[in-house]
Amino acid sequence: MRARIRHTGIVVVDLEEALRFWTEVLGFEIKVRMDEAGPHIDAMMGLEDVRVTTAKLKAPDESMVELLQFHSHPDVAAWGGDASSTGLTHIALTVDDIDAVCARVEAFGGALVA
C-alpha cells in the first residue's frame, strides 16, 4: 500500500484575504467552501462546539490545500516563532514563472526575502 498526501490544512485569521492570496497570486482554484459544525467536526478537531469555515483549493497539479477559519475558538499562538518550533514551519511550492509570482506577491502587499 502506498499513501499520498490528500491535502494540507492551514488555519487562517481572515479566510477572504487568504483566499485572494491563494487564488489571485498562486493560481489555486476554490473547489469546496463550507461552514462546518457538529459532533463529527468536534471529534475531528479534538475541540467542543466547533464552528469553522473551510475552503479546499486545488493547484494546477491537482494537489490540495485546505484553509480553515475558526469562528468558535480564538487563535492560540502557541508557536514559538522560529524554524525549530514544533508544528508547521513552511510549505514549499513550485511555480512555472518565479518572477511573475514574485511580482504578484509584491502587488498583493507581500515582501520578498532572500
Regions inferred by a protein language model and the residue ranges of each:
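Short loop/beta submotifs within extracellular cysteine-rich repeat domains
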Residues: 38, 75-76
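Vicinal oxygen chelate
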Residues: 5-13, 53-71, 78-104
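Histidine- and/or cysteine-centered catalytic micro-motif in compact active-site loops
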Residues: 35-36, 70-72
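Core segments of cupin and vicinal oxygen chelate
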Residues: 11-62, 100, 107
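Short hydrophobic/aromatic-rich motifs at helix boundaries and adjacent loops
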Residues: 26-28, 72-75
